[in-house]
């Protein structure tokens, strides 16, 4: 199971220092919440020093407004937060980017099913989108099971309140990647947080 580090969860370190430290510990992806196009300046800074994949989460009523920048910076993964008000395209294949649909418990799989069929993966939001530090809603364990039954070929990423114990269960459920923000960034050592997210807890813990 891969780990995507939510870089904006760390306010103490400058971006370059944080990226180099995460890379030194073998992080799989850098997760960036996108509310406007200012994040692409940070993507450019990351691209200048790292080859690690960019994992962009668009939370905006007009995702198509970012398509040109996504193409320009060759963003590896893009998930678009579902919003029934979105009238244009959710995705634009470019031969590089893998596209996902981000959904919450409020979003019925029956309603978003036709969009999910066109996506490469789903980002299941287990807490409020774009808000760091919120707890994991355990109702999402069943949501993941339901999703995998309905869309067995789709990969699943989970974001929101993921700690080492939650990560253990998500791995058992077949989740492909997790986003870690507070848990990974707020610990004293990044390496310890990475190890804890990867390891299997003992029954005595």
Regions found by a protein language model. Name each.
Residues 98-106, 110, 120-126:
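Internal catalytic-core helix/loop-beta-alpha segment
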Residues 124, 128, 134-172:
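Active-site/ligand-binding-proximal alpha/beta "capping" segment
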Residues 1-77, 85, 106-119, 139, ...:
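Conserved N-terminal beta1-alpha1 strand-loop-helix module at the mouth
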Residues 82-86, 123-132, 173-194:
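Glycine-rich phosphate-binding active-site loops on the catalytic face of alpha/beta enzymes
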Residues 34, 82, 103-105, 126, ...:
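Short secondary-structure boundary segments
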């Amino acid at each position: 199971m891969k780990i995507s580090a939510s870089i904006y969860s760390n306010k103490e370190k400058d971006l370059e220092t944080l990226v180099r430290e995460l890379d030194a510990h073998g992080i799989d992806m850098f997760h960036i919440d996108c509310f406007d196009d200012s994040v692409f300046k940070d993507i450019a800074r990351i691209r200048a020093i790292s080859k690690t994949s960019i994992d962009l989460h668009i939370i905006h009523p007009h995702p198509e407004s970012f398509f040109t920048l996504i193409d320009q910076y060759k963003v590896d993964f893009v998930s678009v937060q579902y919003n029934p008000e979105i009238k244009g395209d959710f995705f634009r294949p470019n031969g590089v980017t893998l596209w996902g649909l981000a959904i919450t418990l409020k979003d019925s799989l029956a309603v978003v099913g036709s969009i999910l069929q066109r996506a490469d993966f789903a980002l299941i939001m287990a807490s409020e989108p774009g808000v760091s530090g919120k707890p994991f809603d355990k109702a999402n364990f069943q949501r993941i099971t339901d999703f995998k039954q309905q869309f067995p070929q789709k990969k699943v990423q989970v974001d929101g309140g993921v700690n080492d114990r939650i990560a253990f269960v998500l791995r058992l459920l077949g989740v492909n990647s997790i986003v870690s923000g507070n848990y990974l960034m707020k610990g004293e050592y990044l390496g310890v947080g990475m190890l804890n997210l990867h390891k299997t807890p003992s029954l005595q813990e």
